[in-house]
């Protein structure tokens, strides 16, 4: 692939790690953010120490506070901003773009107010004549490992397979590899909903339960993610892939996962507001729990783990009692997609 110009919107941990992947591939990378100290640090010290204490970025990776400058003459735009501001940033991008670009996102969540997936938001806010079909970049990927060039395999999903193949070529190298998929609904719901299950797995750890219990919540969590996804139109096979079970494993078993760490803290009895303040990063699984619970209620989808976590976070239920309560639920067959 020839050298491409790519704007990455959101210089957090994942946006920064992906900027390094693209820079390693010889592309022109521009990070955009709205925190002046962070932008200055990236440009002058070539570090982003809030997320990576010991990493020095290549000097060719630049950052700017000016969205127009970031978007000038780019071939592709990658959204890696928190779910709650995706629509706002997309509107700002739409007001500036003057040429067609490949639009990608690598965030994982559902919009709280509308319950919409992020690709839908981008489609609504950015006119079709200025963008490709949206490409979703998702899968098992700790930024802390990608930034040190550890082997990482993820998915590029789009309704337009050629757009997905472009992104596959854009990012893939000797340590970072993408597989294509056309099931956007499946890939996005898997990426968003696995954060809920990671909170549950972390809570079990915080409560002192062992590997049997953690394996159970991850496996049955995958079952309820699949039930909801299929109801929304996803292909159930997607959930057995990188963006499904792969992402669920990496997020539901690792201390690198902010959602797992948040769940572990909840299990230890810490208050949510203290957890969020101490972590200093967005915990997408907290907001996604509420959205997923509401969607499941509207559609009549059985999601006991999501319900237990929702009641603990939003209704003040004791998290141990909520989890143990699932052990007395009605008996069911293992393979039920409804």
Curated annotation (Swiss-Prot):
Binding, sn-glycerol 3-phosphate: 108, 139, 141, 194, 247, 257-259
InterPro entries in the cross-refs: 6-PGluconate_DH-like_C_sf, 6PGD_dom2, G3P_DH_NAD-dep, G3P_DH_NAD-dep_C, G3P_DH_NAD-dep_N, NAD(P)-bd_dom_sf
Catalytic activity: sn-glycerol 3-phosphate + NAD(+) = dihydroxyacetone phosphate + NADH + H(+); sn-glycerol 3-phosphate + NADP(+) = dihydroxyacetone phosphate + NADPH + H(+)
PROSITE patterns found in the cross-reference section: NAD_G3PDH
Keyword annotations: Cytoplasm, Lipid biosynthesis, Lipid metabolism, NAD, NADP, Nucleotide-binding, Oxidoreductase, Phospholipid biosynthesis, Phospholipid metabolism
Enzyme nomenclature, EC number: 1.1.1.94
Active site, UniProt feature: 194 (proton acceptor)
GO CC entries: cytosol
Residues the entry annotates as binding NADPH: 13-14, 108, 143, 258, 282, 284
Function as written in the Swiss-Prot or TrEMBL entry: Catalyzes the reduction of the glycolytic intermediate dihydroxyacetone phosphate (DHAP) to sn-glycerol 3-phosphate (G3P), the key precursor for phospholipid synthesis.
Name used for this protein in its record: Glycerol-3-phosphate dehydrogenase [NAD(P)+]
Annotated source species: Streptococcus pyogenes serotype M2 (strain MGAS10270)
């Amino acid at each position: 692939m020839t050298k491409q110009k790519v704007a990455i919107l959101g210089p957090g941990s994942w946006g920064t790690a992906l900027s390094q992947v693209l820079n390693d591939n010889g592309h022109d990378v521009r990070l955009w953010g709205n925190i002046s100290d962070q932008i200055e640090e990236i440009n002058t010290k070539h570090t982003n120490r809030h997320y990576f204490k010991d990493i020095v970025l290549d000097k060719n990776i630049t950052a700017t506070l000016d969205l127009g400058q970031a978007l000038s003459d780019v071939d592709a735009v990658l959204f890696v901003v928190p779910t709650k501001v995706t629509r706002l940033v997309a509107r700002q991008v739409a007001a500036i773009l003057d040429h067609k670009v490949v639009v990608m996102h690598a965030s994982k969540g559902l919009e709280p107010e509308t319950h919409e997936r992020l690709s839908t938001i981008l489609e609504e806010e950015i006119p079709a004549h200025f963008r490709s079909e949206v490409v979703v970049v998702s899968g098992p990927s700790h930024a802390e490992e990608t930034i040190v060039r550890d082997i990482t395999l993820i998915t590029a999903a789009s309704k337009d397979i050629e757009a997905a193949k472009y992104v596959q070529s854009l990012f893939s190298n000797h340590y970072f590899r993408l597989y294509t998929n056309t099931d956007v609904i499946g890939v996005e719901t898997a990426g968003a909903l696995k954060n809920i299950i990671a909170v549950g797995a972390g809570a079990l750890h915080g409560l002192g339960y062992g590997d049997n219990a953690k394996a159970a919540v991850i496996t049955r969590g995958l079952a309820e993610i699949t039930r909801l996804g299929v109801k929304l139109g996803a292909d159930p096979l997607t959930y057995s892939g990188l963006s499904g079970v792969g992402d669920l494993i990496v997020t539901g078993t690792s201390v690198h996962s902010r959602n797992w760490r948040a769940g572990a803290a909840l299990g230890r009895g810490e208050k949510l507001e203290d957890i969020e303040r101490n972590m200093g990063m967005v915990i997408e699984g907290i907001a996604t729990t509420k959205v997923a619970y509401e969607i499941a209620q509207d559609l009549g989808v059985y999601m006991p783990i999501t319900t237990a976590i929702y009641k603990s976070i939003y209704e003040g239920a004791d998290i141990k009692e909520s989890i143990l309560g699932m052990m007395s639920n009605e008996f069911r067959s293992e393979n039920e997609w409804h």
